[in-house]
Each structure stands twice: as structure tokens, then as C-alpha cells.
Amino acid sequence: MRSISFKLLLLVSLLVVVSRYTLAYEDSCSTDEECRRNCLCDVAYCDKSRDKCDYGFMNRVDVRFPKHPYISKNKDGSGR
């Protein structure tokens, strides 16, 4: 019984998160406060040129290379 209720709780929470994301992602807006209410976060703002909410962390993916690579190189360019 405990296992079933835990799985049900996980399923319901996943559905809530997905539905909030899809409903709030492309909202039209006129003020920053509208976007922050939809997102329930502080990083959202209204892009007034497009009249759409920009949620910051949800719209961007950081694909930069790390500053310190895992394989260190010597001054002559060799691996170790």
C-alpha cells in the first residue's frame, strides 16, 4: 500500500509540473508581475517587444565549454 501511494504521489506531482510548464511557457503579458505570478519565480520578465513572458532559466540552455577542462595539458601541449 505504501509503495502504491508513493508512486501515485510521484505521478501526480509530475503531471502538475508538466502542466504548469506547458501552460505558463508562452504567456502573453503587459507587465513583469504577470510573468512572475505565472512562473512563481523572481527571474521572469515581460519582453515587451514580443508581448511574451521570458522565464530566464527555462528558455536558455548553457552549452559553453568549462573553463577548466578535465584533462590538463602541459605547456608543450602534451596531455600529461
Curated annotation (Swiss-Prot):
Subcellular location(s) per record = Secreted
Main location as per UniProt: secreted
Cysteine disulfide partners in this protein: C29-C46, C35-C53
Which Gene Ontology terms describe the biological processes this protein takes part in?
A: defense response to fungus; killing of cells of another organism
**Segment forming the signal sequence:** 1-24
Report whether rRNA-binding shows up as a keyword of the record: no
GO cellular component term, pick one: extracellular region
UniProt KW keywords = Antimicrobial, Disulfide bond, Fungicide, Plant defense, Secreted, Signal
Q: Does the keyword Acyltransferase apply?
A: no
Tell me its family: Belongs to the DEFL family.
Q: What is this protein called?
A: Defensin-like protein 255
Species of provenance: Arabidopsis thaliana (Mouse-ear cress)
